[in-house]
Curated annotation (Swiss-Prot):
Record's GO cellular component terms: small ribosomal subunit
Family assignment from sequence similarity: Belongs to the universal ribosomal protein uS12 family.
Record's keyword terms, sorted: Methylation, Ribonucleoprotein, Ribosomal protein, RNA-binding, rRNA-binding, tRNA-binding
Sites of 3-methylthioaspartic acid modification: D89
Subunit structure: Part of the 30S ribosomal subunit. Contacts proteins S8 and S17. May interact with IF1 in the 30S initiation complex.
Function statement: With S4 and S5 plays an important role in translational accuracy.
Biological process annotations from GO: translation
SUPFAM superfamilies the record matches: Nucleic acid-binding proteins
Pfam family, one: Ribosom_S12_S23
GO molecular function: rRNA binding; structural constituent of ribosome; tRNA binding
Protein name, per record: Small ribosomal subunit protein uS12
Native species: Campylobacter concisus (strain 13826)
């Protein structure tokens, strides 16, 4: 605990909070252009081919972002909306592409957690048959 004299000489330092998604520049989302769409493998012990895209954002940053859901329509020069949120088993991937926004299509035939994947509500007649 510092004395009053010590506080007069040296004021208390403010704790600065470092952003986990600096490329968004304090915005909730950013628009960007895909420069490369490819698959990559996760860290041990997981095994898969995760779909990712390198995106040039309007903030000037070039980031690697994850494409969630089954199947996608992205290719080079696609315009995408990028949000924060890292992928734990992919090093360097700290952003997600928003499905159903701009050039990114929503996930087809998605019935649960639809809002996260840009999927419309299915028609009442096309609902799954009850058991």
């Amino acid at each position: 605990m510092p004395t009053i004299n010590q506080l007069v000489r040296n004021e208390r330092k403010k704790v600065t909070v470092k952003s986990k998604s600096p490329a968004l520049k304090e915005c909730p989302q950013r628009r960007g252009v895909c420069t490369r769409v490819y698959t990559t493998t996760p860290k041990k012990p997981n095994s898969a081919l995760r779909k990712v895209a390198k995106v040039r954002l309007t903030s000037g940053f070039e980031v690697i972002s994850y494409i969630g859901g089954e199947g996608h329509n992205l290719q080079e020069h696609s315009i995408v909306l990028v949000r924060g949120g890292r992928v734990k088993d992919l090093p360097g991937v700290k952003y997600h592409i928003v499905r159903g926004a701009l050039d990114t299509a929503g996930v087809a035939k998605r019935t649960v957690s639809r809002s996260k994947y840009g999927a419309k509500r299915p028609k009442a007649g096309a609902a799954a048959p009850k058991k």
